[in-house]
Amino acid sequence: MLCGVEILCSVVAVVARVLGRALMTICSPKFSTAGLIGSPTTAWGGGGAKKKVHMESEKQQLPPPPSPPALVLPAFKRNCTDQEQRAPATSTKAARGRPPRLVIPAAAPVAVARGGVDPFGGRETDVATETEVKGEGFCLASRRGVRHAMEDGYGVITRHKIEGGSQLAFYGVYDGHGGRAAVDFVADKLGKNVVTAAAAATTMSRHQAAGSSSPSQQRREEEDDVTAAIRAAYLTTDSEFLSQGVRGGACAATALVKDGELYVSNVGDCRAVLGSRGGVATALTSDHTPGREDERLRIESTGGYVSCGGSGVWRVQDSLAVSRAFGDAGVKQWVTCEPETARVSLAADGDCRFLVLASDGLWCKVSNQEAVDAVAAAAAAAAGVAGSTDPCKELAAMARSRGSRDDITVMVVDLQPFLPV
């Protein structure tokens, strides 16, 4: 009997020691519930977003642990490569006390209009991706780039009658940057302003010159007045856009045809190239870039500076890669909207066949002569220069296959209907 009691006491003592150790372990602050009780686990996804994965216990759940400190990312000064950020400015102005660098933030995504029927009877498969238009005497193809929403645009006005029986036709290709606000405004306003100003200048010039000068002198004065009217229309459009206080900008290449005269104007790096019957390409515009010597001197003479980063791209105030454009209020002191205009007499040069207007998404990969050759070849297989959109589509495809990542817009204008009979 005594022996049985001793054994029972020993068992109770052992159990007590085990329970005591267990209680000490549970009460210790070093004890971890991981793997024992289903507490929330936080996994960090890309961009600093938190994703909660729950493993719930059927019986009990401890409160979640304290949230980790917020992840703070450094602010980016401008949208360029690390190599370009490190590259020193090579301009002569850069070495001397230049103004502080201007920061132009990247544009937020902009909703793009849905596809539909083009007013010229063309087909718009998806405005955000591609546009194809076959209109009266012209064709167009546009392809969105891979970096952002489509920022190219175009405008066409045909059969605009003015006093004296003359008719005007206007064609334009536009390349926006910093969002769609500027390119949409320019596409809507510039053509109307150019046609209105040119018509008014023609009428006034004819009234003033009536009976006071020879026909040849009168014609020269009228041509000068039309050129001045185009300039005024560009500057007026720019002023109207700036008055809205909206950010962004746009480049342009436009053509006005009147009485057998072709007036081609541009700001920025949109380009116009003339194709002859003999297949010769002639550039009628010169790209406005900070790397152009006369543009650099103009900018520096007004207190600005230009620089070239590691990517080889020249920029105004370390920000903008074109030296003339609509909009761009932050650098307007140096980035003017003063157009350069070239005039070609279609009557005197009956060799003119077509005109190629395009954004720099084409010209960065396709040469002037290649563009003319492609249009001529496609026109030979189709019903004339503007008989289909094939010439424009082939040029856009050529630029894309060679690595162009920008928006590409190509317009081909048939000049033969404007030649004198």
UniProtKB/Swiss-Prot annotation:
Swiss-Prot/TrEMBL cofactor(s): Mg(2+); Mn(2+)
Supply the alphabetized keyword list: Hydrolase, Magnesium, Manganese, Metal-binding, Protein phosphatase
Reaction(s) catalysed (UniProt annotation): O-phospho-L-seryl-[protein] + H2O = L-seryl-[protein] + phosphate; O-phospho-L-threonyl-[protein] + H2O = L-threonyl-[protein] + phosphate
List GO molecular-function terms, semicolon-separated: metal ion binding; protein serine/threonine phosphatase activity
Q: What is the free-text note on the cofactor?
A: Binds 2 magnesium or manganese ions per subunit.
Record-linked CDD domains: PP2Cc (cd00143)
Q: PPM-type phosphatase domain: from which residue to which, for each copy?
A: 137-415
Report if keyword S-adenosyl-L-methionine is assigned.
no
Concerning InterPro entries, the annotation shows: PP2C, PP2C_BS, PPM-type-like_dom_sf, PPM-type_phosphatase-like_dom
Quote the record's binding site residues for Mn(2+) 1.
175-176
Against Pfam families, the record matches this protein to: PP2C
Read off the PROSITE patterns from this record. PPM_1 (PS01032), PPM_2 (PS51746)
Q: Where does Mn(2+) 2 bind?
A: 175, 360, 406
Give the EC number(s) listed in the UniProt record. 3.1.3.16
Q: Its GO biological process terms?
A: signal transduction
Region annotated Disordered sits at 46-69, 203-225
- Per the record's keyword annotation, is Repeat included, yes or no? no
| Source taxon at top rank | Eukaryota
**Family according to the record:** Belongs to the PP2C family.
Q: What is this protein called?
A: Probable protein phosphatase 2C 77
- The source organism is Oryza sativa subsp. japonica
State the taxonomy lineage: Eukaryota, Viridiplantae, Streptophyta, Embryophyta, Tracheophyta
